[in-house]
Amino acid sequence: MIRGIKELKPKIFLFENVEGILSGKWDKKEGKKGEIFRDVWKGFSSIRGYTAQPTLLHAYGFGVPQNRPRVMIMGIRNDILKKSNLKPVKFDPSRENTTFSSQIKNNGGFFPKWDENEIDAPDLIDVLSDLDFTGWSSEKPFYKKKARTDFQKFLRENNITNEKGKEILTDHEFSNHKDHVVKRFKFMLDNNITKKSDLPVDMQTKKFNQKPVPAKWKIKPTITVTSLPDDYV
């Protein structure tokens, strides 16, 4: 990426990675925490003709219904920066890596800031409660329910209707699970099963990765689930 920036000289570049990069090390045994981000920062901040700044943003701060922190580095070409009112916030990579997060979280500068006291990110109920469970291995190409929340109404703005006047819904389909899998999923949801040992013997499998994820959390927003499609129910 750095080679590409030097060659193409874009007005702005943006690097993005997971929060774990702040404590990452090149070698698990002999490496030092934070060395990966120090090297990444050194590479981007030393590109001639650019001014760079890192930040740690949370998607929930901007109304996105999930807890998804991301480390970003933005670089602005100096001739473009001079024409703007933007001012970078300083970052000190020589300090302990344990300070990296506090140094750059919601730090403004090149990036937008959110108000920690006014976070109003929706949860899964707010976002998806207008969708029907139509049954395994099925698909409904239109909404059967009316939008209930402001977020759902926002998602349906300028929505297209079919010949019967119903709002078109795409990609709302369910996997074609076998009966014993459907039975296990239902048991897990009804009984909040999180461990293999809590399942009846006839439902236990050699590999058990499935975990029920609540649709509504005590503290918003909802966690981000990243997995193979069948790992969560």
Where are these regions (language model features)?
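Class I S-adenosyl-L-methionine
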Residues: 2-207, 211
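A glycine-rich dinucleotide-binding beta-alpha-beta segment and adjacent secondary-structure elements
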Residues: 211-233
